[in-house]
Amino acid sequence: AMAELGDPDGAMEYYEKSIKADSSYAPAYYNKGVLLDKKLEHDESLKVLDEAIEKDPKKPNPRFYKGIVLGKMGKHELALNCFESVHRANPQHLDSLFHKGIELAELERHEKAIEVFDKILDKHKGNINVVYAKARSKAAINEVNEAFDLLKVAIKHSKTIKLWARKEKVFEKFYDDPEFQRMVK
């Protein structure tokens, strides 16, 4: 909570004291790992998250967050492995499934990513982030009509998507397309 209240140094000190008091307390390692990531200390974050995983391997959060950090570092195959591991152990953990799809897309395995996004949308049709992610993968494999249909749905529910689409590398090839311009205007 201290980190969210603008005192990351106080939070770090608290986590370190917690670890010193009880070196087996996995949540302190997890929270410290998350905070290190927020401070852009990714390598150190991974080390601490690995300690959290070692202390309590059944908890999904440290492994999930390790996947997030690895993805930020461009280590998409390793990130994918983390998300697959979390999802196998916790099939109801939809965030791990979503991020599995994101990493598949980053690895340009768009057909597989679309399968993952469809699996989520079967259960949660209105998840706009998933709709947008699917639109990105459809655009990447040049299924333009489907990509635009999905993008329209996403934009209808969240104007922020317009901003994302304008900056999204996968949509660059459509910048001169009048329909795309209308959607993101």
Task: Name the predicted role of every residue range.
Residues F64, I68-K72, L94-E111, E115-K123:
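Alpha-helical adaptor scaffolds
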Residues A21, K55, A89, K123-H124, ...:
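Structural marker of alpha-solenoid helical repeat scaffolds
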Residues A139, V144-I161:
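TPR/TPR-like (Sel1-like) alpha-helical repeat modules
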Residues P27, N61, D95, N129, ...:
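Start-of-helix register in tetratricopeptide repeats
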